[in-house]
């Protein structure tokens, strides 16, 4: 029972973090996939490919952390509005009576300093934190997933990456919202 609650909370938390990163102006998906009932686990993910990945990881005997990591990598391929490896996030884990919080948010580059966004008068330079190289941070997602896996994962790391690699290599049918986003952004 405890594992079911942990899995539900972890994946719901991952979904909430991912949903918070989504573009507010993106159109909603055309239709939601049908709900699937289970007595063993629950997965709430806004992408059917990533949901299938989570289900497969659990079926192979992986735990909630394994499923969350594999899902995160899959969403980096199939649901780029919310999932990517170029950002960061947080993971709250409760497993075997132990609670942990993994902070893998983006970090400032090594050469960053507290005045890097100020002009010679000490005023904030408009849009410098939004546009250009100085607006970027050092991504933390992969390092955070790795840290969570090392402490709480049960399957080999390679098995968690394989579904995302397969999706990227073999392709997938993108959601209409992703097609529109790519066309509007890159055409």
Label every model-predicted segment:
Residues 17-20:
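C-terminal motif of bacterial Sec signal peptides marking the signal peptidase cleavage site
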